[in-house]
Amino acid sequence: MIRVAVIGGSGYTGGELLRLLAMHNKVEVTYITSREYAGKPISIIHPNLRGFYNINFSQFSWDKIGEKAEAVFLALPHKVSVDYVPKLLEMGLQVVDLSADFRLKNPELYKLWYEFDHPYPDLLKKAVYGIPEIHYEELKGAKLIASPGCNSTATILAAAPLVYSNILDNYRLISDVKVGSSEGGAKPSEGSHHPERQNAIRPYEAEGHRHAAEVEQELQYISKKEVKISLVPHAVSTIRGALASVHGWLISDDLNEIEFWKKIIEFYRGRKFVRVIRGNIHPYPDPKYVIGSNFVDIGFAVEKRVGRITMFSAIDNLMKGAAGQAVQAFNVSRGFEEDEGLRIPPLRPA
């Protein structure tokens, strides 16, 4: 059994990690931290986990983390994880970081998108971007996994087979992402508090969302071409779920849709959590049918009149968009079955 710590275990992502790791046959969660709730039972904050954990939240301690863990999941805010990762690695611990602090390879992009000088550019080169569908081989044995968030995951998985297939007139894409209120975290703000989002469809960061940087990085890795993407998220009134609609323009108006569908299947062949959607009853991906699971549903539509193709992906933002994908990448890094702890069908109704 691998002894695992969750640092920042009181938020939605931390709670989802704890839910999944409770069902994982290869790990034992030995240390869970929260500054605000130290000393209190896990079930006080996560009542859904009542009976699954008999340990309390702890204050973070460098001495204790070294004694109690072999691998660490960091569910901390951006610009906070960066101060933990180097020392954890020096101590010989594996790190799965769910913040954005090690996702970008180019340190200059942190100045542009996050307005800070990255203090550990050498570690950026060593971090493996944690989408197993794209970086399966690189994740094997990885010591530092930079796990992406929901907007970037949904966009990348929708666009990846598109940019790979050489069917586009240009590589300037638009991603429209609709995402539920849990993306905003457990601490409500005016923009994320659910009563403020109910009955709303609200775009945000429309002038340029910072996740566009990692999306472009990954799509350029896949296509070997310069890719530019405009990523505009929209806050909607669901609690869970994210739907990405990625628009591109075709090089020709005679695309064989059956052949392209086969190319998508081939691109994701062997990946346990990708489901390619095509049919008459539910022809396009819908987050409603992946809630509670680590699946991503992929589909597409072509409007030949204007030469446009739209790729769709639907995920649960707390699962494939956060905790589920982090556990999946951890599994690959350790040589476990990719779906260990994740063999969960979606909820219905949800």
From Swiss-Prot:
The keyword Oxidoreductase applies. Its EC number is 1.2.1.103, 1.2.1.106. GO terms for molecular function: N-acetyl-gamma-aminoadipyl-phosphate reductase activity; N-acetyl-gamma-glutamyl-phosphate reductase activity; NAD binding; NADP+ binding. Its main location: cytoplasm. SUPFAM superfamilies: Glyceraldehyde-3-phosphate dehydrogenase-like, C-terminal domain (SSF55347), NAD(P)-binding Rossmann-fold domains (SSF51735). It comes from the Archaea. One of its GO terms (biological process) is L-arginine biosynthetic process. NADP(+) binds at residues 10-13, 317. It is found in: Cytoplasm. The keyword Metal-binding does not apply. Gene3D superfamilies: Dihydrodipicolinate Reductase, domain 2, NAD(P)-binding Rossmann-like Domain. Pfam families: Semialdhyde_dh (PF01118), Semialdhyde_dhC_1 (PF22698). Pathway: Amino-acid biosynthesis; L-lysine biosynthesis via AAA pathway; L-lysine from L-alpha-aminoadipate (Thermus route): step 3/5; Amino-acid biosynthesis; L-arginine biosynthesis. Disulfide bonds: none annotated. The active site is at residue 150. Keywords: Amino-acid biosynthesis, Arginine biosynthesis, Cytoplasm, Lysine biosynthesis, NADP, Oxidoreductase. It catalyses: [amino-group carrier protein]-C-terminal-N-(1-carboxy-5-oxopentan-1-yl)-L-glutamine + phosphate + NADP(+) = [amino-group carrier protein]-C-terminal-N-(1-carboxy-5-phosphooxy-5-oxopentan-1-yl)-L-glutamine + NADPH + H(+); [amino-group carrier protein]-C-terminal-gamma-(L-glutamyl-5-semialdehyde)-L-glutamate + phosphate + NADP(+) = [amino-group carrier protein]-C-terminal-gamma-(5-phospho-L-glutamyl)-L-glutamate + NADPH + H(+). One of its GO terms (cellular component) is cytoplasm. Belongs to the NAGSA dehydrogenase family. Type 1 subfamily. LysY sub-subfamily. Involved in both the arginine and lysine biosynthetic pathways. This is [LysW]-L-2-aminoadipate/[LysW]-L-glutamate phosphate reductase. It comes from Sulfolobus acidocaldarius (strain ATCC 33909 / DSM 639 / JCM 8929 / NBRC 15157 / NCIMB 11770).
